[in-house]
């Protein structure tokens, strides 16, 4: 497994994992041991007519539980780029983020 050397992972960082099976997962980093990386609420990338989307990785488990992924199954691990991290947060959170600049626009009124 290759770990992006610029990616010092902290608990709750949104990370991307590429598996040897070809699947790409996005989830919240929980912890790492010698054998596994645990991620919470993993989603997988899916292609659609509207572009790339995110869907639940495992449908028959509690998505809030940290899922151990064997390091032997990993190709690489890195922090997720902002636009996909934002999409992940929006899909997994009940909090709706305000658009950028909204606070400044409200202050001006």
Language model features with spans:
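Conserved RNA-binding domains used in RNP assembly and mRNA/RNA metabolism
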Residues: 2-109
């Amino acid at each position: 497994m290759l770990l992006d050397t610029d990616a010092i992972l902290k608990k709750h960082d949104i990370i991307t994992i590429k598996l040897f099976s070809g699947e790409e997962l996005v989830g919240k980093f929980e912890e790492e041991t010698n054998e596994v990386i645990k991620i919470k609420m993993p989603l997988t990338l899916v292609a659609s007519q509207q572009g790339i989307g995110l869907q639940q990785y495992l449908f028959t488990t509690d998505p809030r539980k940290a899922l151990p992924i064997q390091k032997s199954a990993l190709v690489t691990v890195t922090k997720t780029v902002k636009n996909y991290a934002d999409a992940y947060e929006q899909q997994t959170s009940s909090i709706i983020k305000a658009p950028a600049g909204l606070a400044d626009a409200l202050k001006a009124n």
